[in-house]
Amino acid sequence: MIYLDNAATSFPKPPQVVRAMSEAIEHYGANPGRGGHQLALQAGRTVEKCREAAAKFLGVPKPERVIFTRNCTESLNLAIVGMLHKGAEVICSHGEHNAVMRPLERYVSRDEITVKLLRPDPHGLLSPDVLRSAITTDTALVIVCHASNVTGVIQPVRELGAVCRERGVPFLVDAAQTAGILDVTLDTLNADLIAMPGHKGLMGPHGTGLLALREGIDPEPLILGGTGSASESVRQPSLLPDRYESGTLNLPGIAGLLAGIEFVAPQREEIHRRETRLNDRLRQQLKEIPGLTILGDELAPRVAITAVVPAGGDSAALADALDATGVAVRGGLHCAPAMHSYLGTMKSGAVRFAPGPFTTERNIDDASALVARLMR
């Protein structure tokens, strides 16, 4: 199987990720932070080592401001729900994932908040000037997807974040497609909150996510319960990270995420360059196939994502045919209907290709040849 669905989750994982998870399960699979015996302490040390590695990688000065979650969706929900109040205004774009749009819709449907959607320019990019004009005294949060789940186009988040800072509005970045690939830190993005999965560019396992918080940004917790601290009180502790990490943490997942971060950190830029070369090769080959439309502006910066629509608009059929011939891609709306509505592809959807760290040129050439054969 040629795996080109790395925008959904990276696969295969580095061998050290598998080993780290196995070791945690086999040798010290106790409950971190829930006991004083040796195994619980060892489990806790692994959790904190991962937190420290993530904090260093993400430019978070205090490791306790890196919060473990199950995925990017949970990180986004924690940030959104925890930062909003009745009467708040939220600004986001047509590029947002349902992990942003559905939480917002719940509160809009209750007449508790209002949402402004910013339209991108012809290149698919958001304008800092347009954002500046959109912000009002009611704006409580600005949310931007760093790179589109559909087209891969990278937004000018640093400039957008500077506008938010200038206007005193918290800025949340959805780094689902960029963490572990681009330089994603609080300072480089001018972000106050960064939500990300552990299982994509960071090369960790499923069921892992992170939320990075700038000092002074303290959303209300999403889940309340046991933290292993302040157990004498029925009130949720204010101590970080305990405030946000109720319940048993995913020790095997966090052990694997630590190994993933250690794999990515020293070679992030090279991984990005290599994935970009492979994606450029793929786009060039797909452009030569009659009957395919490639989504997204050619001149816009992008991560290694390419989405196409076949003539006739049956993206699901093309994705299924590729699967039957040994190529794993994703067809449909990619949980981003607002973007497809903007692109005019709500009915057709698209077929998304996303090379990863272990993709080869041969994989790209073979996949393109199969697409060409299927489009005849």
Regions inferred by a protein language model and the residue ranges of each:
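Pyridoxal 5′-phosphate
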Residues: 1-376
